[in-house]
Regions:
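Acidic, glycine/proline-rich low-complexity segments that act as flexible tails and inter-domain linkers
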Residues: 1-45, 97-115
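C-terminal structural segments of small proteins and small subunits
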Residues: 81-106
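Iron-sulfur (Fe-S) cluster-binding segments and ferredoxin-like electron-carrier domains
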Residues: 25-26, 64-79
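Amphipathic alpha-helical segments within well-ordered protein domains
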Residues: 32-33, 50, 67-71, 85
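Short, conserved micro-motifs enriched in small and acidic residues
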Residues: 43, 57-60, 93
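Alpha-helical scaffolds flanking conserved acidic
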Residues: 44-48, 77-83
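Short, thiol/selenol-centered motifs that function as redox-active sites or metal-ligating centers
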Residues: 49, 53-65
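Residues in soluble alpha-helical coiled-coils and helical-bundle/repeat scaffolds
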Residues: 36, 40, 57-58, 75
């Protein structure tokens, strides 16, 4: 038996969120609609960006939802995969860049030890 770590997103859960915080839910929905509307960036490009960011934030609901939205807006499989690779490189690059913090601490510890 396979049980998912994340429950399925259902109409019942969406309704419960609306019931618990209706004003906040409405504000978030309005914000989201405005963010993903065509502007300087097309809605398609915004959804591709969202797919990449969702992989960095590791939100399975966001990955699924924004992938579907990107496809609806005309994104290709190749565009989505390239965006995911950009996100992967940025995440790996961040880890690599932050190694400077560890190296700095190593140098401080070595200097303190030798004094």
């Amino acid at each position: 038996m396979s049980e998912s770590l994340y429950p399925s997103s259902t109409r019942e859960l969406a309704q419960k969120r609306r019931e618990l915080t209706p004003d906040t839910e409405a504000a978030f929905q309005s914000f989201s609609q405005k963010v993903f509307a065509d502007g300087a960036l097309s809605a398609k490009m915004k959804q591709i960006i969202a797919v990449a960011v969702a992989h960095v934030t590791q939100c399975p609901y966001c990955i699924k939802g924004h992938t579907k939205a990107a496809l609806r807006h005309g994104a290709s499989e190749r565009e989505l995969m390239e965006a995911i690779w950009v996100a992967a490189e940025m995440r790996a690059g961040g880890a690599y860049a932050h190694s400077a913090l560890a190296l700095d601490e190593i140098q401080k510890a070595a200097a303190a030890k030798s004094s």
